[in-house]
Design a protein with these regions (language model features):
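ATP/NTP phosphate-donor binding region
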Residues: 1-65
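Conserved anion/nucleotide-ligand pocket segment
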Residues: 120-194
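N-terminal amphipathic/basic leader segments beginning at the initiator methionine
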Residues: 1-22, 157, 162-172, 183, ...
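Charged helix-capping and loop-helix junction motifs
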Residues: 50-54, 227-232, 258-266
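ATP/nucleoside-binding phosphotransfer catalytic cores, i.e., glycine-rich phosphate-binding loops
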Residues: 246-315
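Internal helical hairpin/lid segments
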Residues: 203-256
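Short, acidic/small-residue loops that bind anionic groups at enzyme active sites
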Residues: 87-112, 116, 120-127, 277
């Protein structure tokens, strides 16, 4: 099904123009009408143009009438321009059918839109890293993106790793039995841990109670991950959630003086501090295989033994 896809750059400058162009061509080859923003390849220092250029690109994406507004890449840059975004224009665009999709630094935009308007955006792929690969794009990523843009996606599932963490929140909307979880009517939200934790104390972090918070990151040692989780913990963000779902944490290196300090230990430590259920293994993050997740959407989290499901197409 042919869709209008608008590609823009709200964060870091495109580094690999060949990958960017390859991604555009792949989307066109799928039959979509691809419109590339006039400043998509702009560069100012590490950014895709100065703050005004990137703000204008966001607002052009909102005014484009596209079915999908897809970022070229993540990186850094959105947090510094959050005050300049016209959130009413973004909400109107979403109401008219534009789906804003991105990953990584895009978490700042998604959290801000949710906090300011309650509108749903999508955590998903980016052009350069996901569609612009030298090899064929990941099948699961491509299929999830297709489900997103055609409106066919109703949820996602994954296999939990063989790590026993036994605590579980048992409250309103939650059921716990041997090897089973059912959490209903919970807002799905989250994204990149470093970006999300940087929003604590600002008006751009949504005040979600009883939600399902998903997290991912890249290049962060487990002690840094723990420090950011501690910030969310002490700020009261984690206490209000029904579940914390860890995606993929990649590209970090353990050192000798860690002496056994690993990510699994961080997650077990976190579980000991909160009542919410902590799950692992969500296929989302700075990885080729990533699902698409509706940020701000009411969802159902179901676990049966080691099979986990996030469902938003069924009520």
């Amino acid at each position: 099904m042919k869709k209008h896809i608008y590609i823009y750059s709200p964060s870091s400058a495109v580094r690999d123009k060949a990958s960017f162009k390859r991604g555009v061509k792949r989307l066109e080859a799928l039959g979509h009408a691809v419109e590339v923003d006039e400043a998509a390849l702009a560069a100012s220092q590490r950014f895709a143009g100065d703050d005004e250029i990137r703000l204008a690109a966001i607002h052009r994406a909102a005014a484009s009438g596209a079915d999908v507004a897809l970022i070229s890449r993540g990186g850094y840059g959105l947090t510094r321009i959050l005050p300049g975004i016209n959130y009413n224009a973004i909400a109107r665009s979403i109401e008219k059918g534009t789906q804003f999709v991105g990953v990584s630094d895009f978490t700042a935009f998604q959290c801000a839109v949710l906090a300011k308007t309650g509108a749903v955006t999508w955590a998903g792929p980016a052009v350069e890293a996901d569609f612009g690969t030298e090899s064929e794009p990941d099948d699961i990523m491509a299929a999830c993106f297709d489900d997103l843009i055609t409106g066919q996606g109703e949820g996602t599932g994954w296999r939990l790793p063989k790590i026993a963490i036994n605590s579980i929140a048992v409250g309103a909307g939650s059921i716990w039995a041997e090897g089973q979880i059912s959490i209903n009517n919970a807002v799905l939200w989250g994204g990149n841990l470093a970006v999300l934790s940087s929003l604590v104390g600002t008006p751009y972090l949504p005040a979600i109670k009883g939600g399902v918070l998903f997290l991912e990151d890249i290049g962060e040692h487990p002690y840094r991950i723990e420090r950011m989780l501690t910030q969310l913990l002490h700020a009261g963000v984690l206490a209000g959630q029904k579940a914390i779902v860890f995606g993929q944490f990649t590209d970090y290196k353990l050192v000798a003086h860690d002496k056994g300090f690993k990510l699994q230990g961080v997650i077990a430590w976190l579980q000991s501090k909160i009542k919410a259920r902590v799950l692992m293994g969500l296929p989302f993050g700075h990885v080729a295989t990533k699902v698409a997740l509706p940020v701000g959407c009411k969802t159902r989290l179901v676990v049966e033994n080691r099979d986990a499901f996030l469902l938003w197409g069924h009520r």
